[in-house]
Amino acid sequence: MGANVLIMAGGTGGHVFPALACAREFQARGYAVHWLGTPRGIENDLVPSAGLPLHRIQIGGLRGKGLATLLKAPFQLIRSLFQARRIMNELRPVCVLGMGGFVTGPGGVAAKLTGAPLVIHEQNAVAGTSNRALAPLADRICEAFPDTFKPTGKRRTTGNPVRSELFLDSSRQIPDGRRLRLLVLGGSLGAEPLNKLLPAALALIPVEQRPELFHQAGRQHHESTADRYREAGVEAEVVPFIEDMARVYAWADLVVCRAGALTVSELAAAGLPALLVPLPHAIDDHQTRNADYLAREGAAFLLPQATTTAADLAARLSEVSMHPEQLEGMAARARRLAKPDATRTVVDICLEVARG
């Protein structure tokens, strides 16, 4: 294996999955990929499973924390910076790629202190705290959505790295006489407001007009969600988690889901229209900004959680069921927003910086 590359990403799948796509691309080009994370994030499951060496530093989030945590913050930051710097000196990476999460703050500073080229990638339409802080230090800034960062010669709009199997070329035509196929996604933990809203909304639609329903409700909530559908007299397949996203994306005609950056990018890749219900308490309301990107282009409808009732959702579902051509147009517009070359582009930028 060739020279070392260090990827920094942690905390949630929204950071880790795009980073894994980049890791595979680096490996395909002959580079040895190392990973910088924390002891608590999802990277502790996913990165070793991918066969990648995981290096950990002690760092956590500060926003919204209590006074005691804030008082300890300077010491934690200094400790994590020394830990990250030691790892940089051991690995001597030709490039460091920051994909978000708490780990990227001290990791990015350590990269600059040790002279390693630094590239950052922001998955959301609103930049996270670490990436905002690192932007002046970074050699290149990659953004998934246009104009997330201020215009600069370092900025490139790349899209989000998405697994290649999710890019679906087939058209989204709904055959006459077939019921609408509705996919509901709540993420691995589930979105309990959606788990409550969907059964209530579907119960308001006449039985003969109801869509076929596949609902991913989260590991903790799938049984209670299935009970709600049964009590409402609505037929639905409810699962805790979906392993094969490509299969369910190919099956679906319409998706109801949150608006995390990775989800929005996957919808575009799969060419799927969506009803997006952004998480209302997301930091900087970034999910609303993510959703607005698809909604402005006519690829999705944005439904605020605070004002969307079961009756509102039932009416929207009934409308699109009766006008499948509307969904077909939304699907085509979603597909036009896809960035199939995002992974390759991000890695190209990293190696361009590495070569100086």
Swiss-Prot record:
Q: Which Pfam families match?
A: Glyco_tran_28_C, Glyco_transf_28
Query: Per its UniProt record, what InterPro entries does this chain match?
Result: GlcNAc_MurG, Glyco_trans_28_C, GlycoTrans_28_N
A GO CC term? plasma membrane
The record, for CDD domains, names: GT28_MurG (cd03785)
Where does the chain bind UDP-N-acetyl-alpha-D-glucosamine? T12, G13, G14, N124, R163, S188, I242, A261, L262, T263, V264, S265, E266, Q287
User: Could you give a single Gene Ontology term from the biological process aspect?
Assistant: cell wall organization
Regarding protein family, the annotation reads: Belongs to the glycosyltransferase 28 family. MurG subfamily.
This one is known as UDP-N-acetylglucosamine--N-acetylmuramyl-(pentapeptide) pyrophosphoryl-undecaprenol N-acetylglucosamine transferase
